[in-house]
Swiss-Prot record:
The keyword Transferase applies. NCBIfam families: kdsB (TIGR00466), PRK05450.1-1 (NF003948), PRK05450.1-5 (NF003952). Belongs to the KdsB family. GO terms for biological process: CMP-keto-3-deoxy-D-manno-octulosonic acid biosynthetic process; lipopolysaccharide biosynthetic process. Its EC number is 2.7.7.38. This is 3-deoxy-manno-octulosonate cytidylyltransferase. It comes from Chelativorans sp. (strain BNC1). Activates KDO (a required 8-carbon sugar) for incorporation into bacterial lipopolysaccharide in Gram-negative bacteria. Keywords: Cytoplasm, Lipopolysaccharide biosynthesis, Nucleotidyltransferase, Transferase. Pfam families: CTP_transf_3 (PF02348).
Length: 251
């Protein structure tokens, strides 16, 4: 299956304006995310942005960039506009939505998100991590996957998602899983998803992936080892600088 990685990036972040161009270990954040995408070897890498400076920074890293409208409500809408521009012939069968604020994501996790699509019945794939921190279980900013295990050829842990929630769920004994917001869509699934109106549960939980579940689409989550650092605040940015500076120095 031919895959393409699309990285949505916008400058108008509420909590950390201008973050795609923030310096992290001598490179812009968008450059760091592009590097992780290229290291994954999954496929063509394209940055989708509404700001020419971000596009220029991406092109400086040797990848394509496409300008999109500034009024998109979600990264899914932004990457779909970009996809129509850069792949009008629909050659890419799998579309990966890699958030532009994940500079520390392991390349192997980008590869992992594609694996659930080996099941022909799966429309959308994503990632999760088993929660080990008790505080995370009750944290509404940590989205939980409510799902059931599915068999895999490699015996990897994978869930069929039945629901996503900010609540502590499911109830009772057993592990809870932290959702990581990277997605791999079958192209036809992305086309269907962006054409759907917002769902009732989506609006209540403020989680756009619930739109797909409400519409009967199948989402599977590959379970990986750790949650990548999402850069949303100045404190997150400083932590990313520490992590990537240490990684650079150890080489």
């Amino acid at each position: 299956m031919t895959s393409i990685i699309l990285i949505p990036a916008r400058m108008a972040s509420t909590r950390l304006p201008g973050k795609p161009l923030a310096d992290i270990a001598g490179r812009t954040m968008i450059a760091q995310v592009v590097a992780r995408a290229l290291e994954s070897g999954v496929g063509r890498v394209v940055v989708a942005t509404d700001t020419e400076e971000v596009a220029a920074a991406a092109r400086a890293e040797g990848v394509e960039a496409v300008m999109t409208r500034a009024d998109h409500q979600s990264g899914s809408d932004r990457i779909f506009e970009a996809l129509q521009t850069i792949d009008p012939g629909a050659t890419a069968e799998i579309v990966i939505n890699l958030q532009g604020d994940l500079p520390t994501i392991p390349p192997e996790d980008i590869r992992a998100v594609v694996r659930p699509l080996e099941n022909a019945d799966t429309d959308i794939a994503t990632l999760g991590v088993e929660i080990s921190d008790e505080e995370e279980k009750a944290n509404p900013n940590v989205v939980k996957i409510v799902g059931v295990p599915v068999k895999t050829a490699s015996d990897a842990l994978r869930l069929r998602a039945l629901y996503f929630t900010r609540a502590t769920a499911p109830w009772g004994e057993g592990p809870l899983f932290h959702h990581i917001g990277i997605y791999a869509y079958r192209r036809r699934a992305l086309e269907r998803f962006v054409a759907l109106p917002p769902g009732t549960l989506e609006m209540r939980e403020r989680l756009e992936q619930l739109r797909a579940l409400e519409a009967g689409m199948r989402i599977e989550a590959e379970i990986v080892r750790s949650v990548p650092l999402g850069v949303d605040t100045p404190a997150d940015l400083e932590r990313a600088r520490q992590l990537l500076s240490a990684r650079t120095e150890s080489r």
